[in-house]
């Protein structure tokens, strides 16, 4: 993998250069404005290109070091793109209303996430049958409300190492919280926004659907590049090892996988695997996985099933390759 490439033509075709009406501008964006046409400010893409590249590099570097990226975009035209991009690169997102204190009051947010997990367990198990229809409906509504706000971060396991924001005016509370905690912020900054306090300013249209889709795709690909770099630093060639793993190891289906009732001796530190937080490690332990050798023996289908169980299916194959290397170390 390599850092995603893009051209100025792609930015032009996506409408990245179109700012807001000139009378709605923020003077602090003057340095990034090329001029005005029909009372619409035109963003200087000659500056956007290198600044976007810098932001992509920062995202890749953060993920390569085991960091977590939080995508934030709650406006209607950004919601689907933000969620899809974050899921594609095994990162995290908020695409509904930002709850005040999501970052600065993580302890309370964690309690709400715990409640969401409990409701998921209750509603998906036989325990739900012990409630009346009205009680089940009430629980389902509570669960859906929590999932809208917290579903994208319930597996994050802690504060993010960087946030990527679409529309800094709408997401000003998220940015303020990140600044208070010294969390770097990469953001798309339109001509009506204030770039102050944004670590990685990317001047661009934050309203056009095609532009938002392009930003999210590039950030997701940069995060995937970071994952590949992290694997490379461990000496793992996933592409080369995936086929031999399936041929050499005994086949096991998701339905026949048997976890261990407990660790055999000292459990391995599964957090050494890319993207595995303390919360994900606990999920793996709950499935009876405590050692690298257990993951190393999985075939593709079983690994993917386990990845889905813990909410990170896209990283399952990489875990198998990493686990094989770590088990042999």
UniProtKB/Swiss-Prot annotation:
Leader peptide range in chain numbering: none
InterPro entries annotated for this entry?
Ribosomal_uS2, Ribosomal_uS2_bac/mit/plastid, Ribosomal_uS2_CS, Ribosomal_uS2_flav_dom_sf
In alphabetical order, the GO MF annotations are: structural constituent of ribosome
GO BP terms: namely:
translation
Tagged with keyword Cytoplasm: no
The record's PROSITE patterns line, in alphabetical order, gives: RIBOSOMAL_S2_1, RIBOSOMAL_S2_2
Ribonucleoprotein in keyword set:
yes
Q: Which GO terms describe its cellular component?
A: cytosolic small ribosomal subunit
Q: Name one Pfam family in it.
A: Ribosomal_S2
- What keywords are annotated for this sequence in UniProt? Ribonucleoprotein, Ribosomal protein
Looking up PANTHER family in the UniProt record yields: 30S RIBOSOMAL PROTEIN S2 PROKARYOTIC AND ORGANELLAR (PTHR12534), SMALL RIBOSOMAL SUBUNIT PROTEIN US2M (PTHR12534:SF0)
Family per UniProt?
Answer: Belongs to the universal ribosomal protein uS2 family.
Looking up HAMAP family in the UniProt record yields: Ribosomal_uS2_B
Q: What is the name of the protein in this document?
A: Small ribosomal subunit protein uS2
């Amino acid at each position: 993998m390599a850092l995603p490439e893009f051209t100025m033509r792609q930015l032009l075709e996506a409408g990245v250069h179109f700012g807001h009406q000139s009378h709605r501008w923020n003077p602090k964006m003057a340095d990034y404005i090329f001029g005005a046409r029909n009372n619409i400010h035109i963003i200087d893409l000659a500056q956007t290109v290198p600044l976007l590249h810098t932001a992509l590099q920062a995202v890749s570097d953060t993920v390569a070091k085991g960091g977590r990226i939080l995508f934030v975009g709650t406006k209607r035209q950004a919601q689907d793109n933000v969620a899809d991009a974050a899921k594609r690169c095994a990162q995290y997102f908020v695409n509904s209303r930002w709850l005040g204190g999501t970052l600065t009051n993580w302890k309370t947010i964690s309690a709400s996430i715990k409640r969401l997990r409990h409701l998921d367990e209750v509603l998906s198990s036989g325990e739900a049958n012990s409630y009346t229809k009205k009680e089940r409906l009430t629980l389902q509504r509570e669960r859906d409300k929590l999932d809208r706000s917290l579903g994208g971060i319930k597996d994050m396991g802690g504060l993010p190492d960087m946030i990527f924001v679409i529309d800094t005016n709408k997401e000003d509370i998220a940015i303020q919280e990140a600044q208070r905690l010294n969390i770097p912020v990469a953001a798309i900054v339109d001509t009506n926004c204030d770039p102050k306090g944004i670590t990685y300013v990317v001047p661009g249209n934050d309203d056009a659907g095609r532009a938002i889709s392009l930003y999210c795709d590039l950030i997701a690909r940069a995060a995937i590049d970071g994952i590949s770099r992290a694997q490379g630093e461990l000496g793992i060639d996933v592409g080369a090892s995936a086929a031999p793993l399936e041929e050499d190891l005994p086949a096991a289906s998701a339905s026949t996988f048997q976890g261990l009732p407990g660790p055999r001796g000292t459990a391995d530190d599964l957090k050494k695997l890319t993207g595995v937080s303390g919360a994900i490690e606990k999920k793996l332990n709950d499935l009876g996985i405590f050692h690298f050798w257990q993951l190393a023996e999985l075939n593709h289908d079983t690994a993917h099933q386990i990845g889905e169980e813990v909410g990170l299916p896209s990283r399952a194959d990489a875990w198998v390759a990493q686990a094989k290397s770590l088990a042999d170390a």
